[in-house]
Amino acid sequence: MKYAFFFFYATGISIIFGSCRIRDKQLPDVSISNPAQVLFDNEIQEAQQLLKEGDLVLRNGNEFSSQLIKNFSKTDKTYSHGGLVFFENGYPLVYHILQGDQNPDEKLRRDSLKRFCNPRKNFGFAVYRYDLDSIQLARLKKTIHDWYIKGVRFDPLFSLETDDKMYCSEMIRKSLQIATDGSLVLKTTRPTKKEADYYTYYLKLPASYIVNMNFVAVDNLFLNPKCRMVKRYEFDPQQALTGGQKK
């Protein structure tokens, strides 16, 4: 009994620290069987009809690294990643930045909504909308496009001081600030000492650095008077690896 407990304890520790490297296994885009496929496709089609330029799409990742990212949020820990929507030839694409096997070059990228919300890797997603006028939306789109062409990369230091490297929520915060001439500035979050000690394994940064870091948590993106939810979609947890289903 003692040896069995030690085996499971050691195995659990290995899984946790191995996952902190953000090297989650790459899964196929979306290849799920009926009827789950039909349900998920219907949700994506519905969401695409609702999307407008500049919309914020948030997803609720089901991987270990996603769970850690959710914990950076102080108030609402539902979401782990986000991106901004812009239309190309009438088709909506989600612009976002991430690292790991899903994005080896770590550059700002754009994905279809279907790929971004893949039910194999997410519990669900939501669409939010900022209160922006047409001029601000045009500036927002130009800013993100300029960064995309420039090839802005993921920032492993999570520093708000650099613009050539950014993480996803930082990119969204800065682009909104530019688009609105500073009238919309999203709040930031500062980790506690206890949180800094915990996150040091995940971020690969000293706790002394993390505790002094102003971080744009995912809930900072939507817990704002100028941001409202359009619609939220949840996949059935029992079908997380086989398909998407709305509760």
Q: What does each model-identified segment do?
A:
Residues 1-27:
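Bacterial Sec-dependent N-terminal signal peptides
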Residues 18-247:
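Cysteine-nucleophile amide-bond enzymes
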